[in-house]
Amino acid sequence: MLGIPGGLTCFPSSGVGALHTGTGAGIIFPWEDGLDLRLHQAARLGSRSMSAIVDFECPPLNEVICGLHFRRMDRFTAPYVGLLWQKFQTHYPKCEVHPPLTLVSEQDTELQLEMSSFPRVWFVSEDSTRLVQVQQDLLIHNWRQVESSTSYPRYKIVKDGFDDALSKFEAFVADHGLGAVEARQYELSYVNFVPQGDGYESLGELGRLLPDFAWRRNTSRFLPDPSNVNYQTVFDLPNNNGKLRVSIQDALRRSDEKKLTRILIVVRGMHQSQDVSTPDDWFELAHEWIVRAFLDLTSEEVQVKHWRKK
């Protein structure tokens, strides 16, 4: 479900469920299922600009995903894909076809899965760092790191790319009488990869990177250090605006057999309150929670020494 430097192969985990929005390539995940620790956040943190919260010179960020799941548009069928690509082709000259994705809604009290036989189409930029994914009930804009030298263009640019893609898609379906884009759920996801050696040398030392996931290491205990980890935690956003999910997994980069820890932070939901009353409000809230969650979860020593927190 990820996009990482090219030339790699991915065996995705079922980890966080819901929108499976990443771009796949490059990482092996040993686990299929994980420990589900359900935690809850009581109140919204005070509002501050992201620049006032944090800035890293070398962040471990690998991919950012902005997505919208909408009511399925059955009239948007295969013949329209080529016509839609024409609207994107100037900035996304490459096109790929992939199997459709499934939504698991954070808003429903009961688990609801919807499958479609219609494929998912990728419109990919020339340098492969940006892509738009479209299917009958889904639109996603991704930024991904394809080379180690590729720098993150900042959240606003990724969000602007999503807004532009959504505007083009809404105009297209209106022009062709395919129906309206009825939003059901938004998503913002950040994917980070931290190599072993950046503050920790093994999974037994994972607490030096992620203090909440420390492994007790002493000679009197029976169990050795873990060989694999797959932790998941869930936090409620305020006023029923959605959930924040954190997934911690060990992984292996195929290109150099480097051991990594993936920190995936996903927020899904809808604007449900007076202070979060528009899609832009919701994405701002989601972005704030992701940034603050990352700071809260990771050790300050690693933030300063390895990611060069300013």
What are these regions (language model features)?
Residues 13-14:
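Serine residues within intrinsically disordered or low-complexity segments
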Residues 27-28, 32, 36-41:
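Short, positively charged and aromatic/hydrophobic N-terminal segments
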Residues 43-136, 140:
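N-terminal low-complexity, intrinsically disordered segments
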Residues 60-68, 132-153, 181-191, 259-272:
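Glycine-rich, often proline-containing surface loops adjacent to acidic residues and nearby aromatics
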Residues 119-131, 181-256:
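Aromatic/basic-lined ligand-recognition segments
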Residues 160-182:
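Secondary-structure boundary elements
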Residues 256-310:
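Long, compositionally biased interface segments
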